[in-house]
């Protein structure tokens, strides 16, 4: 699947940009976007009661924006590997573009989409910079595991830091195992 050429490079760059920006820079832009003092943030809060800055939702938004490029790149690569003749066959059989996408392209791309999802989750798990900028570090409300580790290390509480580090190591190992399974499954199918 290819976007019209004037827009594909722009959209690709926009969706990949958070991968190359320092997380604090991405967090700064997210803070500007979602602040109640700015148009979009004010609109969300006034009309829907949605507060992103210094909230759990801010943690989710920051982690999603920072990790999205990994998902996007994997999905895009998986979509490009779908044999074009299968898409043409679907068109010949009268399938709509929507049906072709959901019944041919997505199922054949599933391993790549899954591995992108796993990598995105792993990246989101370790997110610190953008989350700190957008959601803050409010204990019990917006503090992530990475922020918690940094906080207890400032207090030289090595036992608590060690506990959280072990949690992250176990989660990361599990995520990498899932990723490995997905990539091996994809190679096995070819």
Predicted ranges, named:
Residues 1-15, 28-32, 78-80, 86, ...:
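Transmembrane-helix boundary motif in ABC transporter permease subunits
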Residues 3-11, 39-40, 55, 85, ...:
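Membrane-helix interface segments
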Residues 7, 69, 76-92, 158, ...:
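C-terminal transmembrane helix and the adjacent membrane-cytosol boundary/short C-terminal tail
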Residues 9-12, 16, 42-46, 77, ...:
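Short amphipathic alpha-helical coupling elements at transmembrane boundaries
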Residues 12, 16, 20, 27, ...:
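Small-residue faces within membrane-embedded alpha-helices
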Residues 27-64, 135-138:
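Membrane-interfacial helix termini and adjacent extracytoplasmic/periplasmic loops
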Residues 72-75, 79, 83, 97-130:
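Transmembrane alpha-helices
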Residues 133-173, 177:
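Interhelical loop and adjacent transmembrane-helix boundary motif
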């Amino acid at each position: 699947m290819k976007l019209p050429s004037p827009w594909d490079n722009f959209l690709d760059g926009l969706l990949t940009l958070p991968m190359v920006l320092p997380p604090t820079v991405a967090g700064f832009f997210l803070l500007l976007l979602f602040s109640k003092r700015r148009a979009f943030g004010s609109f969300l809060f006034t009309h829907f009661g949605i507060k992103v800055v210094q909230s759990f939702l801010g943690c989710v938004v920051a982690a999603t924006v920072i990790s999205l490029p990994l998902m996007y790149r994997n999905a895009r690569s998986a979509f490009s590997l779908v044999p074009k003749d299968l898409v043409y066959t679907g068109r010949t059989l009268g399938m709509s573009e929507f049906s072709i996408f959901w019944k041919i392209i997505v199922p054949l791309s599933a391993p790549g989409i899954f591995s992108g999802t796993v990598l995105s989750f792993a990246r989101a798990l370790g997110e610190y910079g953008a989350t700190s900028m957008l959601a803050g570090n409010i204990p019990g409300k917006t503090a992530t595991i990475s922020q918690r580790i940094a906080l207890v290390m400032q207090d030289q509480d090595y036992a608590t830091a060690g506990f959280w580090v072990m949690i992250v190591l176990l989660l990361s190992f599990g995520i990498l195992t899932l990723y490995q399974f997905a990539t091996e499954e994809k190679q096995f199918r070819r």
